[in-house]
Amino acid sequence: MKKFAIIVFSLLFACTIGFAQMANPNDPLKNDPAVRIGKMDNGLTYYIRHNAKPEKRAEFYLFTNVGAIQENERQAGLAHFLEHMALNGTKNLPGKTMINYLESIGCSFGQNINAGTGVEQTSYMLNNVPMLREGILDTCLLIMHDYAAFVINDPAEIDKERGVIIEELRTRRTGQWRLFEASLPYLYKGSKYATCNLIGTIEGLQAFPAQELQDFYKTWYRPDHQAVIIVGDIDVDQVESKLVALFADVPAPATPSPKKIIPIPENDDPIIGIITDPEANSTSVDFLIKSEMIPFEMRPLGMMYLINMYKAFVSNMMNDRFEEIAQKPDAPFIGAYLYFSPISKSCDATYFSLSSKDGESLPAFESLLLEVEKMTRFGFTQAELDRVKTNYMRRLERAAENTADRKNAEFVSDMITHFSDKYPILDPVYELEVAKGYLPFIQLDQINQIAQQMITPENRVVVVSSPEREGVSIPAADQINEAFKKAAEAQLEAYAEEVSNEPLVDASSIKAGKVVSEKDGVFDSKIWALSNGVKVVIKPTNYKKDEVIISASVDGGTSVVPVECVPSIENNVFSLWSQNSGVGNFNATALKKKLTGKIANVSPYISSYSSGVNASGSPQDLETIMQLIYAYIVMPRFEASEFEAPMAQIKAVVPNLEKNPNFTLQRELMKTLFNNNPRREFISSALVEKVSLVNLEKAYRSCFSNVNGMTVTIVGNVDMAALKPFVELYLGSLPSAKQPAKWADDGALIQKGKINNHFKVVMETPKTSIVNIYSAGIENTLQNQVFMNSVKSILDMAYVKSLREDEGGTYGASVQAELDNRPLSQGMILIVFDTDPTPEKQAKMRQIVEADIMNIAKDGPSEEYVSKTKENMLKNRQENVINNNFWNNALKSYYIDGLDIVTSYDDIVKNISTKSIGDFLKDFIKQGNFIDLSMNPQE
């Protein structure tokens, strides 16, 4: 198999003499010196790092270099099953002892206590654990220790978990999942990966002997395959001492079973797969070229980093070209991209992927191949390379700026890849210096040679995925082969570069407004009132050195838009239009080029009762961010040619989504909740037919024609003196009327009374989905918000125990608790879950759901659940207050909704009780509003 990276080595080797010594790519790169890396005598590896963001918190991971690929033919799905069993009892923490303990200190199942299984690895994690006392550290180490070698795997618990995992299979086995499984025999032809099944089959999960699971655990879970990772506000020396002493009894195997690297066979002729599914969301083509992986011993070298820089530049330039094509009105594909990624431990790949309109996968693939052919024949331009270099370095500069502000979780992935794949753990400041040393030596001719070398005639795989629907044509294998020949013989012209040098916004033509008053605001903020009626609330922070977040909101939204215009600003339509439209004289492609080297993310929105702009970026690009906010409000683009591409995307996807049972469930939920209110119409083919650019423009200009009453919140590392002229120029000049903008009561309230909606749909994987909704008119206060969040937390715990653990009837019930203040204050508690479609199981599950919530309303929740909820809410608040996003939301809540979510929060949480929650829920339910919605398989 072609060693793509080795070829790159040879192309670059001649240049290495010119590198400065500090940047010599033949030398190994340095691991972050703050990371303590050790290996015990039994083979266990550990990584420990101190970091105090957030304070008094830590991450604990056990990474096991074992996954589904280690299963034999009798063990399909057992690597994943084992992950579940680790949470069901260990030697030192039997039963639910571990989860109960962690919940008692504020952790929650799913958010802070979780695990994940892949083909190659399994991870167990405890996230954001409060380090309030030494005993918590000791217990978390004990949990990792028991995961590593002392999971009980009790046969009785295994039998109880079978139902949970079978229901997980029902939930996960969507059309996209089935297409993924169907693609494996083509992607991995001739290897074990071709039949590797992450979750198993219903029949296998029902019948496997407990001994098989115990054998898998004993064979593969051993210290030479494992790494313990601990990052947080801890003493590194203390943790290392405790870890080494505790894990000393984890036995190294006397006769270890070797973990083999499984090869993927080469192929001279393209392997071509054509796969379909009735519930597929879209048509796609994946085209990959396999190559050998870089040997482990080469991965720590600077040369490996340099190769990855080359790959990043090639993929970014190619993806910019694909994006430019996709935005054209006659685009041959909806979207396409190139990336480089291993498909196994033994096989790397150059990966092209596209999505197309149904029935047009062949012409889309032919167009993609022509672009690939252009790349190999003509290469890239110097302007393209300069842009991606600038953006790459700007990203690294920002990471270096924010080095001291990284959260604990941000360190973990680099430690995992160091253990599993031998890549170095780079400190961002050091990485920036390395990249600076390499950058001058990356030349266009080398880039273009690499682009040529990565496209080879052998080891190609093409997988076409399509909805299985009457009238949708799919290509044959010989047509795919013919497409390769046509591209190779095509008459082509090199890519032509177009760049505009005009300013994004002509500041000289703008009449600035003025700050007419200044005063102190809440939460250490400052308030500037502008001459056009805009209120600007600024909170300077140092939570992240290179970050600023801005939100602009004015009343109105869809509530004041003519009803016939509402479909044209439906969320999906509006989002795709704004992404493809650009601003002023810049279409989307030109705008992206104009913003080279800038960290400025700005997007307009129109919601039910307000419209505005959300923005984030770097403080050094603050003027650019302000210019974009101004441009989206004053200089939007409504070009018919630019509207065709997003509409083509929507028209291609929506008909397929309508065949998806989960989509149907969401549609029926919205219809039932709001009694078919036309201002809450869920996206559908019928809605798409009502969309027009004329109505979109009419609605948009209506929403943004008057900023009087707009509230703009600015949070982050901002200099007030530097900010003020930008605010006066770009915000003070926005159009306003004499009267502030208002929102209107659109009548979109949750239906009252008792309502049933039971329906059937055709589905490939039979399951029943049940949604129960309680609603009530309640005042939007912080006290009630805390009660709603408490009810959600308590019901989550109750249903994990009753529906999942005791009944084994679902993978999980999702509980949502929402409180809105427009058009009227109204709360909603929503419970949704999937289960076995038999009538008996449905009836039992419904009975449990109702009994749990009614018992809590009658008698109040248990003291245990209340205590766990309070600890979790207080813990989460402590973590959130060091984020700019939290304070941006707090300021918006205060100055737009009149609600202080900060000052009394801790006191309110500490004072909730079994009685107060029970009384709240009782009053909520007794209003008598209940929706029972269910989706069953059509026979």
Q: Where are each of the predicted segments found?
A:
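Proteolytic maturation boundary segments
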Residues: 20-48, 235-309, 314-323, 327, ...
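M16 family metallopeptidases and their MPP-like homologs
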Residues: 47-49, 54-71, 77-79, 96-146, ...
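Hydrophobic, small-residue-rich alpha-helical packing segments that form membrane-like cores
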Residues: 162-212, 216-225, 229-231, 236-243, ...
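Non-catalytic, conformational "gating/processing" segments within enzyme and secreted inhibitor domains
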Residues: 162-163, 176, 213-244, 458-460, ...
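Feature representing long, continuous alpha-helical segments
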Residues: 308-312, 316, 320, 366, ...
